[in-house]
């Protein structure tokens, strides 16, 4: 059984809550277990908890769940690009998948609501990657 850790952003929680629920349902559908869930203030705060989860022997992959909505500045782009870069670095450092279930940047609230399936897609990706890496 694949064991997943979720790191979930509280910012735009109405949207990340829906993303989390779809991710939970899909993990159960795929027969994966989610023994760890960590809430963080925002997407930019994800790297340290991701690192801690990746250090655990009973975590096969980490799922990130977040939503970054466009504002009046380029803040959304800076947040997502830097988080994605560091998340990828951690995946390579620990040799475990970290699936990007983060919607944004450059989207409106309405677009974000239409993208709540990103959490589900991240679970799908992580479970596939764990199984394929185990076969190498």
UniProtKB/Swiss-Prot annotation:
Query: Pathway membership of this protein?
Result: Cofactor biosynthesis; riboflavin biosynthesis; riboflavin from 2-hydroxy-3-oxobutyl phosphate and 5-amino-6-(D-ribitylamino)uracil: step 1/2
Superkingdom assignment: Archaea
Which residue positions are annotated as catalytic?
75
Report a single Gene Ontology molecular function.
Answer: 6,7-dimethyl-8-ribityllumazine synthase activity
Upper lineage: Archaea, Methanobacteriati, Methanobacteriota, Methanomada group, Methanococci
Which InterPro entries is this protein grouped with? LS, LS/RS, LS/RS_sf
Residues where 5-amino-6-(D-ribitylamino)uracil binds: 11, 43-45, 67-69, 100
- SUPFAM superfamilies xref list: Lumazine synthase (SSF52121)
**Which family is annotated?**
Belongs to the DMRL synthase family.
Q: How does it assemble?
A: Forms an icosahedral capsid composed of 60 subunits, arranged as a dodecamer of pentamers.
Q: EC number(s) on record?
A: 2.5.1.78
The UniProt entry, under NCBIfam families, shows: lumazine-synth (TIGR00114)
* Top class in the EC scheme: transferase
Q: What the protein does? A: Catalyzes the formation of 6,7-dimethyl-8-ribityllumazine by condensation of 5-amino-6-(D-ribitylamino)uracil with 3,4-dihydroxy-2-butanone 4-phosphate. This is the penultimate step in the biosynthesis of riboflavin.
Q: Name one GO cellular component term.
A: riboflavin synthase complex
Q: Which CDD domains match?
A: Lumazine_synthase_archaeal (cd09211)
The entry marks the following residues as binding (2S)-2-hydroxy-3-oxobutyl phosphate, namely 72-73, 115
Keywords recorded for this protein, A-Z: Riboflavin biosynthesis, Transferase
Output this protein's name.
6,7-dimethyl-8-ribityllumazine synthase
- Which reaction is recorded as catalysed by this protein? (2S)-2-hydroxy-3-oxobutyl phosphate + 5-amino-6-(D-ribitylamino)uracil = 6,7-dimethyl-8-(1-D-ribityl)lumazine + phosphate + 2 H2O + H(+)
Q: What GO biological process term is on the record, naming one?
A: riboflavin biosynthetic process
